[in-house]
Amino acid sequence: MQSKYIWLNDKLVNYADATLHFLTPGLHYGVAAFEGIRCYKTARGPAVFRLREHIDRLMGSCKVMGWRQLPFDAAQLIEACRLTVQANGFQECYVRPVVYQAEGGWNLTTDAGKPYVGIAVWEWNGYLGAEAQEKGVRANVSSFTRHQPNVMMTKAKIAGNYPNSVLAKTESVRLGFDEAIMLDTQGMVAECTGENIFVVLDGRIVTPPEGSILCGITRDSLLHLARDLGHEVTAQPISRDQLYTADEVFVCGTAAEVIGLREIDFRVIGSGRTGAITRSLQEAYHAAVHGNHPRSAGWLTRVESDGRAGRTLDDHRVAV
């Protein structure tokens, strides 16, 4: 089903009419903050996964970007996301809110103009291919290094950060791989182009520390789910050679969900298929996003209006 409407500065406009001027500063300089969010079909209707956490991160990205005042607060953006999904009639979709420099900014400062906000939704059919979750995918260690935090603010999801990922992913695909693993400036594992990474070493789940990575909402979800399942989880530096000798390696992100890596740099990882721990986390995550997990109530925001805009399914959580 085609998207019908896009939300722009508090108005739903027809999909075809949601256009930008060629000289929009955010287009030229990457001065935009955004989020990638998923809406899933549940027994109680469509619901957005961890919407509040995504919008909180968006607000943090805007603060890092230097905007002193935004046209909408977090509660209004949560409601706008819900309304946009509802207006388009989707049961499952991808949700993309963007805050961008729309006016001024030619002197390379966010103080010269003002930000606008848009929210788009579209149907989502998977990111790394239909067989990725079952069989896992192939990855390489990229020749491109992940940003150092004082070069590009790595905790902010900012458009200008993403050419780093585009270069690495393009190289990876042209070499015949599905995804790229990026190292930090110290040569330790950071993350993939659009996902965080986990490694299973001697039965322990290990993930890189927060230093140079974008702290993913899916990553945070898996940390909770893994501990719920009784797994030991540690954030610690991971070397490149530990990737090759790991029992399992898996990546996670809003778009990819949870995907095993069956091969890295032509080296088979574990059994060469999605491992048991990865599989258990896939199942727990899928249950959570579809409303079938004990954590679902606190993590899902219903799309259908119940008079309490933006409230989660958990009636005990405070409404925004």
Kindly give the residue locations of the regions a language model identified:
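Short secondary-structure junctions
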Residues: 86-93, 231
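Helix-start/capping segments and mature chain N-termini
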Residues: 1-72, 76-83, 105-320
